Amino acid sequence: MARRRQLYEGKAKILFEGPEPGTLVQYFKDDATAGNGAKKGIITGKGVLNNRISEHLMLRLHDIGIPTHFIRRLNMREQLIREVEIIPLEVVVRNVAAGSLAKRLGIPEGTRLPRTIIEYYYKNDSLNDPMVSEEHITAFGWACTHDLDDMVALTMRTNDFLSGLFVGIGITLVDFKLEFGRLWEGEDMRIVLADEISPDNCRLWDAKTSEKLDKDRFRRDMGRVEEAYQEVAWRLGILPEATNSDMKGPEVMQ
């Protein structure tokens, strides 16, 4: 296995130096967290499934012209991505009331919202990722108005496409979180979709039964977490057959 220099480790992924300038290797872990890291656990095989699911969805988005950092999947747990300057915001898209929105506004969970709602959260673990407004974002220089316009346009297109895709396999896209980055190509910069799209950062409910098929099963101690992730992959037609060697992490060069 190739020896790579580790650059960053987050809750669910590790970033390594890529084989070429301007590239990184993104490794998907089985670690699971909730409550901004207050609850921790392991979901066996989660990294393998999320790698495949995110690859599939990123490629489908690329097909309709949405720029992403994804280049290609390397193996069961790793993918090659473009190195981008991450914008320190989480863009949350809500189609159905659930989670913090339902609690904060007293809306019964499962209520279809009058229209899609976009929220912004400042990425800062020590502050518990506070919700912020466009005024905060531009005032503190996290993103300019033009960047935000691009992010919103890409977010709405992504939501429209993914909502339809999931409807086609009997799943409701309740809400999800996106992250964006600035991709520099010489003097030119464009906003691209980054991070991942998986049951880790999407709320996915069975369209008929409203059974949760996402990380809420871990957050709420509902059990059958692995099975839920497998169900999503199976419906997408990409359920992988992992071997023991696929479950090992990469060899790290200190």
UniProtKB/Swiss-Prot annotation:
Matching NCBIfam families: purC
Xref: Pfam families: SAICAR_synt
Top-level class of the enzyme under EC nomenclature: ligase
Keywords, ordered alphabetically: ATP-binding, Ligase, Nucleotide-binding, Purine biosynthesis
Family: Belongs to the SAICAR synthetase family.
GO biological process: 'de novo' IMP biosynthetic process; cobalamin biosynthetic process
HAMAP family: SAICAR_synth
Organism name: Gluconacetobacter diazotrophicus (strain ATCC 49037 / DSM 5601 / CCUG 37298 / CIP 103539 / LMG 7603 / PAl5)
GO CC terms of this entry: cytosol
Record carries keyword Nucleus: no
PROSITE patterns with a match to the protein in the record: SAICAR_SYNTHETASE_1 (PS01057), SAICAR_SYNTHETASE_2 (PS01058)
Pathway: Purine metabolism; IMP biosynthesis via de novo pathway; 5-amino-1-(5-phospho-D-ribosyl)imidazole-4-carboxamide from 5-amino-1-(5-phospho-D-ribosyl)imidazole-4-carboxylate: step 1/2
Protein EC: 6.3.2.6
Name by which UniProt lists this protein: Phosphoribosylaminoimidazole-succinocarboxamide synthase
SUPFAM superfamilies: SAICAR synthase-like (SSF56104)
Gene it is expressed from: purC
